[in-house]
């Protein structure tokens, strides 16, 4: 799989960056539609995005480097080279959400009002962004048989044939799951006006899919013998259930 999309002079533009950019652009288009549904300012959303997106990239890289520091100890300058991958989505979510919270607090805007609108766009960006892993031949699962991989389209088979071995296309599993969650979140955004429900549904549903898919991957970040992504996913599921339960419970009181 060729990770280079095209060249600008001597500069190689990698598919990884192209795919992330496409995901961000389509996420913004979806947000334009969802802002109308919830009657929130799209201009304010754009301002929020301009703070959240770079914060998320920094957080995703920092999170990855912390757990893989041995790979960078002898060449620290490579920490700043993200063109070949090395972004951990959980770090991106944490830093992005924190940046948004600080910004909206400063602007005296409702945090949940805006992150509810953002949730479908975030998961859409993640669904598309996983294809960047495909072009980088990363974030795949363990070895599989030719018979198993033959059930997938030919270009997936070709991309998952790495150094003489076929691998689980876990990037594809997560991409499909994220697209399904995105559709559900857009539906939920139309059906409920309760602040926080859509965003917490995103946290819970993404975490649910990631927990199971992570178990198939061969490049997980570890804390001792524990896969970090699975640990964070469990916490995300618990937080989501707790928050949504309390919203529903509060509604029944009144």
Swiss-Prot record:
GO biological-process terms attached to the record: lipoprotein biosynthetic process
Predominant localisation class: membrane
Keyword Transit peptide: no
One of the record's GO molecular function terms: phosphatidylglycerol-prolipoprotein diacylglyceryl transferase activity
Residues annotated as signal peptide: none
TM stretches of this protein: 11-31, 49-69, 84-104, 109-129, 169-189, 196-216, 228-248
Swiss-Prot/TrEMBL keywords: Cell membrane, Membrane, Transferase, Transmembrane, Transmembrane helix
One Gene Ontology term, aspect cellular component: plasma membrane
Membrane topology: Multi-pass membrane protein
EC number(s) recorded for this UniProt protein: 2.5.1.145
Residues that bind a 1,2-diacyl-sn-glycero-3-phospho-(1'-sn-glycerol): 130
Coiled-coil ranges per UniProt: none
Function: Catalyzes the transfer of the diacylglyceryl group from phosphatidylglycerol to the sulfhydryl group of the N-terminal cysteine of a prolipoprotein, the first step in the formation of mature lipoproteins.
HAMAP family reported for this sequence: Lgt
Designated name of the protein: Phosphatidylglycerol--prolipoprotein diacylglyceryl transferase
